[in-house]
């Protein structure tokens, strides 16, 4: 059987070539991993089955001593047979391939227009975003302190409302002097204290179904006088600014 299958092929292949094709793309030879391998002798003798353990040892012995760092970096995927070629027939040295990074650099060098176009596209995209982010038109009502825009509603803390309620129970109408004292004590403006007391008096009238608070005539007059003085001072400040 061996003479019928092997001898006709022996004349076709040279000594050192295998019965199997030598265009593998694997990390290790296929016959090394097997328990037995069909190999030829150095003198072109008849083939025979031999154990491949000593071939594996020689392969790794020569491979570790003969492989350099540059060769390992250039050929990480395919491992060529180092040492005597007669020990590993049929596994010719595969062409070394470059690393993925080297291939990527080569592709960039080979096609410089792609890289330049990508850079230009990214720069154009950033410029477009910057143009969109900055508003081209600024209307008066968009400004934070625009004259035509209403200010937000003032919120009072729990401590402020408690102190204002105490002051309201003691006297529902405040003089200007007392209003200044309360505003400084609570960290509010005079206008905020004045508006709070006005709203609180309206609430009390609705709850009690009365038009006026008891004994509020003199106090209303005092408050009106204080409001007039305040308005006059504001007018004087505006005139001085002009």
From Swiss-Prot:
Subcellular location per the Swiss-Prot or TrEMBL entry: Nucleus
Bias kind Basic and acidic residues: ranges: 206-220
Major place of residence: nucleus
GO cellular component: microtubule cytoskeleton; nucleoplasm; nucleus
Disordered: region residues: 114-154, 206-242
GO biological process terms held by the UniProt record: anterior/posterior pattern specification; negative regulation of transcription by RNA polymerase II; neuron differentiation; skeletal system morphogenesis
Span(s) of short sequence motif Antp-type hexapeptide: 138-143
Extent of Polar residues compositional bias: 116-136
Keyword DNA-binding attributed: yes
DNA-binding region positions on the chain: 149-208
Biased composition (Acidic residues): 221-242
Domain of life of the organism encoding this protein: Eukaryota
UniProt keyword terms in alphabetical order: Developmental protein, DNA-binding, Homeobox, Nucleus, Transcription, Transcription regulation
GO molecular function: DNA binding; DNA-binding transcription factor activity, RNA polymerase II-specific; sequence-specific double-stranded DNA binding
InterPro entries: Antp_homeobox_TF, HD, HD_metazoa, Homeobox_Antennapedia_CS, Homeobox_CS, Homeodomain-like_sf, HTH_motif
Similarity field: Belongs to the Antp homeobox family.
Function, in words: Sequence-specific transcription factor which is part of a developmental regulatory system that provides cells with specific positional identities on the anterior-posterior axis.
Subunit composition and interactions: Interacts with HOMEZ. Forms a DNA-binding heterodimer with transcription factor PBX1.
Name of protein: Homeobox protein Hox-C8
Upper lineage: Eukaryota, Metazoa, Chordata, Craniata, Vertebrata
């Amino acid at each position: 059987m061996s003479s019928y299958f092997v001898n006709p092929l022996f004349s076709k292949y040279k000594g050192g070539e295998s019965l199997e094709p030598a265009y593998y793309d694997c990390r290790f030879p296929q016959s090394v991993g097997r328990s037995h391998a069909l190999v030829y002798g150095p003198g072109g003798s008849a083939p025979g089955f031999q154990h491949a353990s000593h071939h594996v040892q020689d392969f790794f012995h020569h491979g570790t001593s003969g492989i350099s760092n540059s060769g390992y970096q250039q050929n990480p995927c395919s491992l060529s047979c180092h040492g005597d070629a007669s020990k590993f027939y049929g596994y010719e040295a595969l062409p070394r391939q470059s690393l993925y990074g080297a291939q990527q650099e080569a592709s960039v060098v080979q096609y410089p227009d792609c890289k330049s176009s990508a850079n230009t596209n990214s720069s154009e995209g950033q410029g477009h975003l910057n143009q969109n982010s900055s508003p081209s038109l600024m209307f008066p009502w968009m400004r934070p302190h625009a004259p035509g825009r209403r200010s937000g509603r003032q919120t009072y803390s729990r401590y402020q409302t408690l102190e204002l309620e105490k002051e309201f129970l003691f006297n529902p109408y405040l003089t200007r002097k007392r209003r200044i004292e309360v505003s400084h004590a609570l960290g509010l403006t005079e206008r905020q204290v004045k508006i709070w007391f006005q709203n609180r008096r309206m609430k009390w009238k609705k709850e009690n179904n009365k038009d006026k608070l008891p004994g509020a005539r003199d106090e209303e007059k005092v408050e009106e006088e204080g409001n007039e003085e305040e308005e006059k001072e504001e007018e004087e400040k505006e005139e001085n600014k002009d």
